[in-house]
Structure formats: C-alpha cells, structure tokens
Amino acid sequence: MPPDAGDPPRPSATPILIASGNPGKVAEFRGLLRAAGVDCRTPSDIGLELEVAETGETLLENAVIKARAFAAASGLPSLADDSGLEVDALGGAPGVRSARWVPGSDDARVKALLEALAGLAPERRGARFRAVLALAWPDGRLLTAEGRVQGRIG
C-alpha cells in the first residue's frame, strides 16, 4: 500500500553528500534534507577535502561537474547546486559568473549592478534568479532540477 500523504518522511537508506564547503549552503540544504527524512553528510563529516573548479559555461554544467566530482570522490550520492542572476538589459549577465563578475563583496556586486542599470526605466530592468540542482550517484546516474524567480532590479 502506498504511503499516505500525511505519513512522516521515511529516512533514506543511503546518506546524501552535500557537495559544498559553503557553511550557509550546507546549513540550508541540511535543514531541508533532514526535514524530508534524508540522512545527509558534508565533506567535513566524512573527511573529504575537494575543490572542484566550476569550468562549465552554464549553471547546469557547473552543478553537474560538482555533483559528479563529489560522488566519485566520496562513493556517496552527491547533491550540488549552482545559481545566478540573469539581467535582461545586460544580455543575461552576470549569469553563471554572478559570484565572480565583480571582485569583492556582495555589496560591491550590488553597487556595480545598480550602476550598470542607472537611467534605465523600470520596465527595462527585468531579471531572474536561477538555481540548478544536480544529484549524482557514483554509478553515473544523474538527476537535475531547476528553479527560477522572475522579477525586476529596483
């Protein structure tokens, strides 16, 4: 008999590795996965030190690169993400390079973005935030998902 929608989530048999060393990202994923009954681990939990270069041209490519690298190194299914802001007036930039398009802090990137859009009418400030997840298994299986939020830069 299938589980009732009100049944509590069942714990996963195999832990999932959160393929990130970013403490904020790890805490967010850990909270979501645990609430769903998923046993999750971090690279530090299993003594794994791995830096993966984000060499992809798209958010999807970067998420897949990271998930596959962590799955291969750990022997565990591994969940990775990549995200970015795409601004219509900037031809979709900064996109996949959102965290690197302006050196420095988030505040510096916000300031640069607002300066780049200065003088544009609100209707020309369309943008979207995209986040892509990739779950890779050591045997090569792969599952991906994407979410996006459409909006306007103030």
Language model features by range: what are they?
Residues 2-17, 21-154:
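Anionic-ligand binding patches
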